[in-house]
Design a protein with these regions (language model features):
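Alpha-helical multi-pass transmembrane bundles of energy-transducing inner-membrane proteins
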Residues: 24-26, 115-119, 123-208, 290
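Cytoplasmic-side transmembrane-helix entry/capping segments in multi-pass membrane proteins
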Residues: 28-35, 110-118, 163-170, 241-242, ...
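Transmembrane helix-loop-helix hairpins at membrane boundaries of multipass inner-membrane proteins
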Residues: 2-3, 18-101, 105-115, 191-196, ...
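Structural signature of hydrophobic alpha-helical transmembrane segments
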Residues: 2-9, 83-91, 134-143, 210-219, ...
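Juxtamembrane/interfacial segments at transmembrane-helix boundaries in multi-pass membrane proteins
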Residues: 50-76, 174-231, 235, 257-281
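Single conserved hydrophobic/aromatic residue that forms the stacking wall/gate
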Residues: 288-299
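Membrane-interface helix caps and helix-loop-helix hairpins in membrane proteins
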Residues: 106, 128-136, 267-271
Length: 299
């Protein structure tokens, strides 16, 4: 088994352990053991990665593994990491570990809460190790689905409103993202959804890039709280439980930025360069709204 698959296997084992656990002590034991294992694995991966780079390994992605899932659509379980994804895995593991203790006394439905929390964590880790477009999208959605319940059930204040608003906006972003990913795949003429191979082909027509890039960037940008699609974020943060807010701000929103870089800008660099003026306008809007806001959580 590839070492990177540990980051999906551990949450799966945690889900099984939580499902079978009886009593609060057993539930906490499963969470602490699993979160500790993820943290240790991320630290080990960081040292292994640095060791490979120090030894002169210049491969774009390290610790690669590919397993074909569905041949007709060329969907594979393809994993690999570079410096950015290694850093994000380490950050995610730290937040999952600390978030576990932040939820130590959470009531009610402690078992169900940790089941959804673990499922969200699995989606995050799976997304950061994936290099296949379909697999990335699958883990991306796995990470988003639990947010509705984690906020709507265990949140506070206007939790139902915040959860519904978050869900509707992220669903809209996911629809744009799915269209963009399919457009990239069919437009590239590739026989695989592996983003490294699509990037090497580099044959997505510029006219198509100008269509698929905005859709993909917008799809990820909604989760990354890209202006003006950020209005769900303040409500979500204010209503979410502490640990969920930690994971939300520290990791989940980073999925959006990582996806913009890893898929949109990496696979369609010409469109990214041509449409860079949009980023300048959005930056100006962000500075203006930040100056006008009277509550920091609304920035």
């Amino acid at each position: 088994m590839n070492f990177l698959s540990i980051f999906v296997l551990i949450p799966l084992l945690m889900l099984a352990g939580l499902w079978a656990a009886r009593g609060i002590k057993a539930i906490r034991g499963v969470m602490v053991t699993g979160a500790s294992a993820l943290l240790i694995a991320s630290v080990v991966l960081t040292f292994l990665y640095l060791g490979e780079r120090s030894a002169g390994n210049t491969a774009e992605m390290l610790f690669r593994a590919d397993t074909l899932w569905y041949a007709p659509l060329h969907i594979s379980y393809s994993v690999g990491v570079d410096g950015i994804s290694v850093a994000m895995l380490l950050l995610s593991a730290v937040i999952v570990f600390t978030g576990t203790f932040a939820s130590w006394r959470l009531q009610p439905l402690t078992k169900e809460y940790f089941l959804w929390f673990t499922l969200l964590s699995m989606g995050v880790f799976g997304f950061f190790i994936s290099v296949d477009l379909f697999t990335m999208f699958m883990f991306y959605e796995i990470a988003l689905i639990p947010m509705y319940l984690l906020i709507g059930v265990w949140g506070s204040g206007r939790k139902e409103y915040a959860a519904m608003k978050l869900t509707l906006m992220l669903m809209g972003g996911s629809a744009f993202l799915l269209i963009g990913i399919l457009g990239i795949y069919f437009g590239s003429g590739a026989t695989t959804m592996n983003l490294l191979e699509i990037a090497q082909l580099h044959n997505i027509p510029f006219a198509q890039q100008c269509i698929w890039f905005p859709l993909t960037f917008l799809g990820f940008g909604v989760l990354g709280a890209l202006f003006p699609f950020h209005t769900w974020s303040p409500d979500g943060h204010a209503s979410a439980p502490t640990a969920v807010s930690m994971l939300h701000a520290g990791v989940l929103m980073k999925l959006g930025g990582y996806g913009c870089f890893r898929i949109a800008m990496y696979l369609m660099p010409e469109a990214a360069n041509e449409l860079s003026w949009i980023f300048l306008i959005l930056t100006g809007c962000l500075l203006y709204t930040s100056d006008a806001a009277d509550d920091l959580i609304g920035v």
